[in-house]
Amino acid sequence: MLGEGSDFFDQGGYKFLRCYNNESIGFTVVMNLRANISAKPYYVGTETKYGELLPKNKFYATKAKVSRIKTIDEMDVPDKFFDEFQCYAYDGTKLKKFFPGQTIRNMNFYRDSEDIYEDIVDVRLENQSLEEQLEDFKECSRALKKYDNFWRSDRAKYLKLQEHCDNEYNRVLDKINNKK
């Protein structure tokens, strides 16, 4: 019977991503995304590179390919998004950059997309002001607006991503106004 560990099926996995503007003012995480990866069974193990046994919801891949990147609510993110934003995943010691089609080496991944939230690590700078956050979300929205006249198939995706930035901008603006 074919299944996990078979040479006929790639192992699928997931990783939580934090995305920043290329022109970021204050290193604000402007969007959280999810990377879908695939790895050949012979590149997959149940121990880390240090020999530590992983929980059942994780696996270690010596070589994996980022097959697609989606929003948390399952919308595919167009590849051009990564011209304006940089997305990173935490590998246990540092942040690694992710983009579609990339080969990732020596990293733990989750078997179930619901488990990716275990990877959330607060990496924001402590001295980041609300004004810097506001400026970063404004830049996020501006960067996505240039795709308003993009291909019809991707236009709705860019509008949804832009709406997220606009909502976060308004949330931070409300915080600033409530402080006054």
Curated annotation (Swiss-Prot):
Coiled coil as UniProt keyword: yes
Coiled coil: 114-147
Keywords in alphabetical order: Coiled coil
Superkingdom per UniProt: Viruses
Similarity comment text for this entry: Belongs to the mimivirus L74/L77/R857 family.
Record's protein name: Uncharacterized protein R857
Annotated source species: Acanthamoeba polyphaga mimivirus
Source species taxonomy: Viruses, Varidnaviria, Bamfordvirae, Nucleocytoviricota, Megaviricetes
